[in-house]
Swiss-Prot record:
This is Probable NAD(P)H dehydrogenase (quinone) FQR1-like 2. Residues 49-60 have a biased composition (Low complexity). PROSITE patterns: FLAVODOXIN_LIKE. NAD(+) binds at residue 83. It comes from Arabidopsis thaliana (Mouse-ear cress).
Amino acid sequence: MGKGGGCVPSKKKKPATTGDGPGIDDDNDATNAPIQIDDDQTTIDGDRTTATNTGGTTTPAITTTAAKISSPLKIFVVFYSMYGHVESLAKRMKKGVDSVEGVEATLYRVPETLSQEVVEQMKAPVKDLEIPEITAAELTAADGFLFGFPTRYGCMAAQMKAFFDSTGSLWKEQSLAGKPAGFFVSTGTQGGGQETTAWTAITQLVHHGMLFVPIGYTFGAGMFKMDSIRGGSPYGAGVFAGDGSREATETELALAEHQGNYMAAIVKRLAQP
C-alpha cells in the first residue's frame, strides 16, 4: 500500500502489457475476420483440451470432445425482398460466406403474405423461383443465419415478422438457442430506418436465445466513405432503394459481401472444439 492509500505493483510480479492490435487493411480480407485472442493457448490432446497460460503453467480446462467437422458449416441467408434490393445484398452476401473454407451459404425466401393480385398492383417483379421458400422447421439445420428484409415504419416488413411468428415450436424447445445471426436491410431514405430496422429485430433473436452478431466497423475504411450516399451501419449491411429505381452501389454490395465473410468466420470460430 503506497502513501495516500494507493496500490503499487509488486516488485516480483510486473503488470502484463499488451501490444498494439493489427490495423485495418482494405485489401486483406483476413484482417476483417475476428481478432484472435491468444492470452491463453489451448492444445488438443486426444479427446481432451488443456488450457496453458502464457506463464507456462497448466490450468484446468473444461473437458470437451474434439469434434471433427466432416461436412461444411451451414449459414442460411433468409430474406424477404419485394423489389429486389434485399435480394441483391443476399446474393452478394452468399459470395462472402462461400469464400471462407469449410462454410457454405444457402439462399432462402420467406413466404409472401400478400395476394398475387396485390403484388401485381404494386408492380413488384417476379420472384426468383430458383431460390426456395423456407419453413420454420428447416431453420434447425443451420449453424448460423443472416436475415434480410426491407423496412416498414422503422421495423421489419410484415412478411418477415410473419415468418418469425411461425417459429413458435422452435421457441418452445429453444432449438435455435446459441446460434449466431445477423441482419441486413433496405430502406427508402437515409432516415428511413437503416439502424432501427435492425435493432428492433433483435428481440426476435433474444426470445430464441440466439446470438446477435453485428459487423461493427470491421469493414474498415469502407464504413467511413462519405463521397456518396451509402446504406449500411454497424448493425449490418444495407441499401437505399429510393423510389424503387435505385440499385445497390458497389460499396453497398461490398459491405454485404464483407458481412457474409465476417459471419462465416464467426460461425467457424464457434464450431471449434
